[in-house]
């Protein structure tokens, strides 16, 4: 169940669901999702579903990972390395989405507020020999100002409102995608222009909440 063939079947399902960016699909195919899930869940690693990680967190559904990255890359493939440039991820979890991003972006900064998860992420990324990801144990709502600004910000937990710190850390010309909402949630795409921010509400989604502090 962990073979490349199984992984490619997952990619075909993503294509069937509407993911058209072949570069994103190739990145999804390159990352062995089974090493990022609990051993007891390894047989379900390539299902298109979120899976529990412990600590009330989940590893995101593959379709949502691909969809968010596709939104961030659209129209920027020629202007930025990997269509993403320098990327900030909020909610690194076990490191799966960071590993996918790292197939495309030259530099990925990933923040996680739960210490046991970030230790697992470090181990998983080391196993993959993925050395262009910098992991930080910190409050994701505050972003990572020391490496700002970012061309791309991706958030893997739902905020009641867009965190101001993340807006400040987005470069002019940059894009951010994140789920917004307490009850009903939707993906929001935010683009920073010289004049300000453009915000577009997109797909209905369900994510764990974006919490403050660390644990």
Regions found by a protein language model. Give the residues of each.
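Conserved nucleotide-cofactor-binding alpha/beta core module
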Residues: 72-198
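Class I SAM-dependent transferase core
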Residues: 1-88, 100, 104, 117-131, ...
